[in-house]
Each structure stands twice: as C-alpha cells, then as structure tokens.
Amino acid sequence: MKNKLPPFIEIYRALIATPSISATEEALDQSNADLITLLADWFKDLGFNVEVQPVPGTRNKFNMLASIGQGAGGLLLAGHTDTVPFDDGRWTRDPFTLTEHDGKLYGLGTADMKGFFAFILDALRDVDVTKLKKPLYILATADEETSMAGARYFAETTALRPDCAIIGEPTSLQPVRAHKGHISNAIRIQGQSGHSSDPARGVNAIELMHDAIGHILQLRDNLKERYHYEAFTVPYPTLNLGHIHGGDASNRICACCELHMDIRPLPGMTLNELNGLLNDALAPVSERWPGRLTVDELHPPIPGYECPPNHQLVEVVEKLLGAKTEVVNYCTEAPFIQTLCPTLVLGPGSINQAHQPDEYLETRFIKPTRELIIQVIHHFCWH
C-alpha cells in the first residue's frame, strides 16, 4: 500500500544509512543484504512481486528484481546497490547520514547511485500500477563498483526481455546511449635471478619487459589509427600503462617484472578481438622467451556499449528531455543489460560527484527526475 511508504527524504535517508560498500579488499567489502531487504519490503508494499537472487562468487551479495504487470515487453529501471569505500579523513560529514545543505543532499551513494531507488519509489506514488498494460521491472544489482558480478549474473540467467531499459547512473539527466569498455591486464615476465657481476648467468625480466612494452606501444598506435568513433571526446581506443614493478636490489639480475595496463575499447569491438590483438602484439617476446611471459586479467572485462540511435527509447527520451543523447568514456552495467534489450544510461546527479569525498546530489534534480520516471513508465507500460 502506498500509504505505508515513508516520505521521499526518509527513504533516501534509510538507503544512505545502510552500508553496502563493494571492495576487492575483503576487509572493506560488505554484503548488500540489508539494503536489498529494505528495497524488497518497500516494493512489496507497492504491490510488486519481488525475487531476491544470490550472486555466485561474491561475499553474500544479492540482486533484487521487483515486477508488476503482465505480458511481454515493458520497461526495466535498473541500478546498483553498492558504493565505493570512503576515505574517512577526507569526508567532512558522516557518509552514512543524509544531510541537506545549500541545495545539496550529502552522503555516500546519494549520486552514485542508491538515491535513484528513492526517486523510483517516490514516483510510483503517482502511478496507478493496476492499469499497466505492459510490465514494469525494477532491478537492483550487486558489486557494480568492483566486478559487476550482479549485472553479469542477472543478464546470463534471466528470461526477461523488456522492450527497453534505463540505468539510473548519475548523468545530470543527460541521456547516454554509448560508452567505452574496460579491459585491465597484468603482464608478468619471469626471468632468472643471478649476481649482477655476471649478466649471462641470468635472464633479466626488466629487459624482457622493455621489449614487451615496445610491442604494447606499437599496439596502442595501431588501435589509434585503425579504430574511430567520432562522437567520443577521445575518438579511439586508449591503452594506458598504469603500474610497473620489478626487481629487489641493484646488484641482482631481476627475476620478475610485472606491468599493469588497461585498454578502453570502442563499442563494437569484441573482447575476443582485443585479447587476440594483445596476444599478437606480445607474440615476438613469447616466441623468443618461451614460458616466461603471461597475461592475466586484473578485473573481469567490460565490453563497450551502444544503444541504436534510431531506437524508440532514444527518440522518446530525447523528446521528453529536449536533449540529445551523448556518449561517455566511463563504464556502467549497460553492456550487460543491453544483451536483454535496448538500454539508456540516465539519472540524477553528476558523474563528477561519483567516488568523491562529501558526495552529494543537488536538490534541483528531484522534481525533474520524478517527473521523468512517471513519464517513461506511462509511455512504455501504459501504451
């Protein structure tokens, strides 16, 4: 029942007060079970059917799917329940206490992106869900900030095929229809240690890595020349060498060297294609030094994503907002949801606030976000 639902600001406050940090470091990682329970109870109060899905390979993490209405198609509104960790020394406010000041709502997850669920719940007060002609789905996922395991698993296991989806990441209510992917690898070279006074008795891993880096930089140049997507501010795939470490003393032949790198592919480039290009680039080193070079994923890869620019979802949202869709360089869960249906990324708050101390969402987004959610539900679920 709608009268059981707390006021908008109290929903927001409860979401922010419920920690749901995702981190690769086990000591910082938290379950999102309490937050999922909160959301599940509220959607049940509104008459939704609710399914809670354990996500394999995680530390007690869950997805939630709330659904109402019958038939095929419909609309999926999606978002993630987790946040990044916070740096206690850089926050001037309690990250788990929602505070309002000077037209801003402060708290961890206000913009990225637990607050989106408060907007959905509040908007549903003004939607007669008994009159829906197509189903409405609300998806809350786990671990977006680390492995994206929740969205991956949901996309792999669900039979749902909505007409379209909107992911409420903070885009300042500017619709996003495409973004790059992300691949992060560790290049490891195993040499053979020895005393530096006789280099011939060892294999210097740093020297081998120097050779490997030369080939990787050639790949970077080839990617820039071969692939283009002019709508992006950086209109080609980027390759970055982000971290390197090797050796332990100046008088020892380096036995091991490790390089961390990432590639941000354009939409349409497959992960298999990129892995092949990287392996081909490193093949001369591997052939010269068999068994000494390995390539391992640092994180599960994320492909690029694109919603067809002429899809009805794009046309409807552009008309409602009076704004053209954009493309961005950061990543979201859209590549996985896009395997189910055409998907846009669109939500309140600024991406510039994501992962920042004293994260906030400007209150000027409250009214237009609420109105937009009502409008897209009416368009895709009532017609």
UniProtKB/Swiss-Prot annotation:
InterPro entries: AcOrn-deacetyl (IPR010169), ArgE/DapE_CS (IPR001261), Bact_exopeptidase_dim_dom (IPR036264), Peptidase_M20 (IPR002933), Peptidase_M20_dimer (IPR011650), Peptidase_M20A (IPR050072). Its cofactor is Zn(2+); Co(2+); glutathione. Zn(2+) 2 binds at D112, E145, H355. One of its GO terms (biological process) is L-arginine biosynthetic process. Binds 2 Zn(2+) or Co(2+) ions per subunit. CDD domains: M20_ArgE. It catalyses: N(2)-acetyl-L-ornithine + H2O = L-ornithine + acetate. Keywords: Amino-acid biosynthesis, Arginine biosynthesis, Cobalt, Cytoplasm, Hydrolase, Metal-binding, Zinc. Zn(2+) 1 binds at H80, D112, E169. Pathway: Amino-acid biosynthesis; L-arginine biosynthesis; L-ornithine from N(2)-acetyl-L-ornithine (linear): step 1/1. It comes from the Bacteria. GO terms for molecular function: acetylornithine deacetylase activity; zinc ion binding. GO terms for cellular component: cytoplasm. Its EC number is 3.5.1.16. Catalyzes the hydrolysis of the amide bond of N(2)-acetylated L-amino acids. Cleaves the acetyl group from N-acetyl-L-ornithine to form L-ornithine, an intermediate in L-arginine biosynthesis pathway, and a branchpoint in the synthesis of polyamines. Belongs to the peptidase M20A family. ArgE subfamily. PANTHER family: ACETYLORNITHINE DEACETYLASE. Homodimer. This is Acetylornithine deacetylase.
